[in-house]
UniProtKB/Swiss-Prot annotation:
Protein name: Protein THYLAKOID RHODANESE-LIKE, chloroplastic
Ranges annotated as spanning the membrane: 102-122, 266-286, 289-309
Keyword Thylakoid: yes
Quaternary structure, from the entry: Component of high molecular weight thylakoid LFNRs-containing protein complexes containing LIR1, LFNR1, LFNR2, TIC62 and TROL proteins.
UniProt keyword list: Chloroplast, Membrane, Plastid, Thylakoid, Transit peptide, Transmembrane, Transmembrane helix
Function text: Rhodanese domain-containing protein required for anchoring ferredoxin--NADP reductase to the thylakoid membranes and sustaining efficient linear electron flow (LEF).
Region (Disordered) residue spans: 1-29, 344-478
Bias type Pro residues, positions: 405-414, 449-478
GO cellular component, one term: chloroplast thylakoid membrane protein complex
All copies of domain Rhodanese, residue ranges: 142-248
Transit peptide, residue positions per record: 1-21, 22-58
Membrane topology listed for this record: Multi-pass membrane protein
Biased composition (Low complexity): 11-21, 353-391, 427-448
Length: 478
């Protein structure tokens, strides 16, 4: 050990070995190239991580001795020279690169290539990844921008339940993932989360099925970050196995299952159910609905017609005209008819009491006239029966009222003496028959009423047998 110490501390040869043969001093440029080569080899060995053991091997005793001798300040008698690092200047590096360009390029590539590969193959942090269930729950509680997305099918979520995020004052967004409809999935997410650049999503699946794939998909479409829960909801190290808060499934009917989590997509079934319920309610309570509608119409009419002065005057005038011109006349006519029917007897009941009252008066005045007028009470029955029959058409010609269609001849004028005699006879007859005036017309009205005449045909042919008129006589020969 003492000999070794003397060798390291002094450049003089040991007495056990022969002194080295004197060599010519190498040029300074050659020494610098050697030093640059040694340093470059050491750098390449460090960069490659020990791939080239020969370049990174330690210096031997002779090489160390030679370097210490070269770095000494004089010839062989120089004493007290210490080992110093090689002085590599900028000029020496430039000279080496100029003389050995291939070696310099290889050295630079060997140093830069590992750094480039580290950046490309995963040196930078990715915005998506896989985390444990406990870490995911902690992120949901601590980070305001973290949201839980449940991508399980709706049937699995209803059967097993969902995570309970009441501690974080949040709610899991149930958005089922379908690998064949990625655009629809992203659209549903955009409806739920309006600020994707500041939103971190925690993806929960039943197991590790599609959670990591969805995390990569959402980060590629503008979300800040996304992390898949390890083993999902029901895995060995998933959410349930980690004893994290969990909401048990609901056994009864729930409107939230029909409506869903999104407020923008109301299912069609809920709309149909609401329409059906409203229809049944309106059908069963139709009277109440009509009353309500009528009340609403009256309120609207009063509000629109009576608020302003001009509308109020016009409305009151219309109401007055309605009651005076449309409603009142009809009611007045109906009331007059009812009063007339109550006070005035009918036609059939009016004739019979008049006959019964007139019969005693005629019996007291003239017994002979009473016997003559005993039969007339049956006459009104005949009149009522004839009135009930349909009316015959009245002929237009007066000749039908005469037998054989022959009117009577005009009377010849009488002498003045005969005229005065006839007038006196008529006056005496009128005075004699005065007491029976009240009863005689009623008795004589029935026999004088002639039956209605048959309608007169417009053609003369019905007057001939077999509708054949007689032939015209042929003229005789002269």
């Amino acid at each position: 050990m003492a000999a070794t110490t003397t060798i390291l501390s002094s450049a003089a040869p040991t007495p056990l070995t022969a002194p080295p043969r004197a060599r010519a001093r190498a040029p300074a440029a050659r020494r610098r190239r050697l030093r640059a080569r040694d340093i470059l080899g050491a750098a390449l060995g460090l960069a490659n991580g020990g791939a080239s053991a020969a370049l990174a091997a330690p210096l031997s005793y002779e090489e160390t001795l030679r370097l210490s001798t070269d770095s000494g300040g004089g010839g062989g008698g120089g004493g007290g020279g210490e080992f110093a690092l090689p002085d590599l200047g900028l000029g020496g590096v430039l000279d080496f690169v100029a003389q050995n360009p291939l070696a310099a390029a290889a050295g630079v590539a060997a140093v830069a290539l590992p750094l480039v590969l580290a950046q490309v193959l995963g040196g930078a942090s990715k915005p998506y990844g896989v985390v444990s269930a406990a870490a995911a729950y902690r992120a949901l509680v601590e980070e305001p921008g973290a949201q839980l997305v449940d991508i399980r099918p709706p049937g699995d979520a209803r059967q097993s339940g969902a995570p309970d995020l009441r501690e974080a004052k949040k709610k899991a967004a149930a958005v089922p993932y379908d690998g064949e409809d990625k655009n629809g999935f992203l659209k549903k997410l955009s409806l739920r989360f309006k600020d994707p650049e500041n939103t971190t999503l925690v993806i929960l699946d039943k197991f590790d099925g599609n959670s990591e794939l969805v995390a990569e998909l959402v980060t590629a479409n503008g979300y800040k970050a996304a992390f898949a829960v390890k083993d999902g909801a029901e895995g060995r190290r998933g959410w349930l196995s980690s004893s994290l808060p969990w909401t048990a499934p609901k056994k009864g009917f729930s409107l939230s299952d029909l409506i869903g989590d999104g407020t923008d997509g109301l299912p069609v079934t809920l709309g149909l159910a609401a329409a059906t319920g409203l229809g049944i309610l309106a059908y069963t309570e139709i009277e109440t609905v009509l009353q309500f509608l009528g009340s609403a119409a009256i309120v609207q009419l009063v509000a629109s017609k009576l608020i302003y002065a001009e509308d109020r005057k016009r409305t009151l005038k219309q109401i007055d005209d309605f009651f005076n011109k449309k409603v009142a006349p009809k009611e007045l006519v109906d009331e007059i008819k009812e009063i007339g029917q109550a006070l005035l007897p009918s036609t059939g009941t009016k004739s019979q009491p008049a006959i019964t009252e007139a019969a005693p008066a005629t019996a007291e005045a003239a017994p002979a006239a009473a016997t003559a007028t005993a039969a007339p009470p049956a006459a009104p029955v005949e009149e009522t029966s004839t009135e009930a029959a349909p009316a015959e058409p009245t002929p237009l010609s007066p000749y039908t009222n005469y037998p054989d269609l022959k009117p009577p001849s005009s009377p010849s004028p009488l002498a003045p003496a005969e005229a005065t005699k006839n007038e006196s006879e008529s006056e005496s007859a009128a005075t004699e028959s005065a007491p029976a005036v009240n009863s005689a017309p009623v008795a004589e009205a029935a026999p004088e009423a002639a039956p209605p005449a048959a309608p007169r045909p417009l053609s003369p042919y019905p007057n001939y047998p077999d509708l054949k008129p007689p032939s015209s006589p042929s003229p005789s020969a002269p």
